[in-house]
Design a protein with these regions (language model features):
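Extreme N-terminal starter segment of soluble prokaryotic enzymes
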Residues: 1-5
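Short helix-loop-beta junction
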Residues: 15, 20-28
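A short, well-structured beta->alpha microelement
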Residues: 27-38
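Structural alpha-helical scaffold elements that stabilize or flank donor/cofactor-binding regions
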Residues: 38-39, 72, 188
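An anion/phosphate-binding loop that grips the pyrophosphate of nucleotide cofactors and donors
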Residues: 42
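Structural motif
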Residues: 46-48
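Cysteine-nucleophile active-site neighborhood
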Residues: 51-131
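Amide-donor transfer/coupling interface in amidating biosynthetic enzymes
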Residues: 109-220
Length: 220
């Protein structure tokens, strides 16, 4: 039986992620853990995140789980969700100081805030930041976690920052938010045994459950 752990470091939509994974993969042993030893025993790891990235990184450090996550990322399938995706990158402009917040450095890239000037529409109205609600996701590159999910499927977002990966080959999913002509933003990244999404699979109905199911069955 596959043992899958959800990292509980005090910041994340843990209960919803747990329930969605249990529903998507009832044959898996899904656990919420806060002990580094249990991460070592796991076959697969989910890193959720919710709120501000500086706080998430601080809580992860304080929990004593940061090294366990880095060790797991070296060899085990790892899924980052929402701020959990942002934490995988080098740094984020979201910060409590004038300096960017360092991330885990697992996928080269930087987290950027949506630009207010891109939110003004032709009729003078403005889209709100954070980007909140359902939006389509274009599968920019093929990946096992897109299996049985149609291209341009809708997923649920709640965020003000987005990942800009340094290597375009790591951007496997994109979406758009802003005035017509605004460049797409990356909403799913992948490298080797790591996959991460800005959107919330646990809030994304059938397609979100399928993505979780694909993660449980993924053999990178």
């Amino acid at each position: 039986m596959t043992r899958l752990v959800i990292i509980d470091y005090g910041m994340g939509n843990i209960r919803s992620v747990y329930q969605a994974l249990r529903h998507a993969a009832p044959e898996a042993d899904v656990r919420v853990i806060s002990d580094a030893a249990e991460v070592k025993q796991a076959d697969r790891v989910v890193l959720p995140g919710q709120g501000a990235m500086p706080d998430c990184m601080q809580f992860l450090r304080d929990s004593g789980l940061m090294q366990a996550v880095l060790d797991a990322a070296a060899s085990k399938p790892l899924l980052g969700v929402c701020v959990g995706e942002q934490m995988l990158c080098d740094a984020s402009d979201e910060s409590h100081s004038a300096r960017p917040t360092p991330g885990l450095g697992l996928i080269p890239g930087h987290c950027l805030r949506f630009r207010p000037e891109d939110m003004r529409l032709d009729d003078g109205s403005r889209l709100k930041i954070p980007h909140m609600g359902w939006n389509n996701v274009a599968q920019r590159l093929p990946h096992a976690l897109w299996d049985k999910i149609p291209d341009q499927s809708m997923f649920y977002f709640v965020h003000s920052y987005h990942v800009a990966p340094r290597n375009p080959a790591h951007a496997v999913g994109v979406s758009t938010y802003g005035k017509p002509g605004t460049l797409p933003f990356t909403c799913a990244i992948a490298r080797d045994n790591i996959f991460a999404t800005q959107f919330h699979p646990e809030k994304s109905a059938t397609h979100g459950l399928q993505l979780y199911r694909n993660f449980v069955n993924w053999q990178p």
